């Protein structure tokens, strides 16, 4: 069901994770955020090929985790979430996805991309 929203709770509130397509992707993929550079928010899209436990985290340039956007099991599909950096300073940030197929103890897919916050 397109545009089905799933909410993930964290310390900064509820973050919507939208299923933008239920078409099952052939592979896992972390897309480039848009816009980039951004202020104060940017869209992050990713594809999940199999039912998986997904973590999507944001790190600063020193490698410190500044936000966890997703930490839950997701069904196959194409997803989008919004990263709001309203309370963060300008600079380079990295977003990392870590996917573990449901029932597996080993990682299935991991990728990291760079984004720039300009205030």
Across the structure, where does each feature detected by a protein language model lie?
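A glycine-anchored, Pro-Gly-centered beta-turn/N-cap motif
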Residues: 75-79, 89-92
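C-terminal tail/sorting-segment detector
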Residues: 90-119
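Glycine-centered coil/turn sites that cap beta-strands in beta-rich domains
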Residues: 17-59, 68, 80-85, 98-106
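Short, compositionally biased serine/threonine- and acidic-rich segments at solvent-exposed termini, linkers
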Residues: 1-21
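Solvent-exposed serine/threonine-rich low-complexity stretches and specific carbohydrate-binding patches
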Residues: 66-74
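Extracytoplasmic/periplasmic beta-strand context in beta-sandwich domains
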Residues: 4, 81, 113-114
């Amino acid at each position: 069901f397109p545009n089905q929203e799933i909410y993930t709770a964290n310390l900064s509130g509820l973050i919507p994770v939208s299923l933008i397509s239920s078409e099952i992707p052939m592979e896992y993929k972390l897309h480039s955020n848009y816009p980039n550079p951004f202020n104060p928010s940017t869209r992050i899209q990713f594809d999940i090929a199999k039912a998986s436990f997904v973590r999507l985290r944001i790190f600063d340039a020193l490698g410190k985790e500044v936000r966890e956007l997703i930490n839950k099991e997701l069904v196959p599909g194409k997803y989008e979430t919004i990263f709001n950096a309203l309370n963060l300073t300008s600079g380079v940030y990295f977003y990392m996805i870590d996917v573990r197929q449901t029932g597996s103890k080993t990682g299935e897919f991991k990728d990291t991309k760079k984004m720039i916050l300009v205030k």
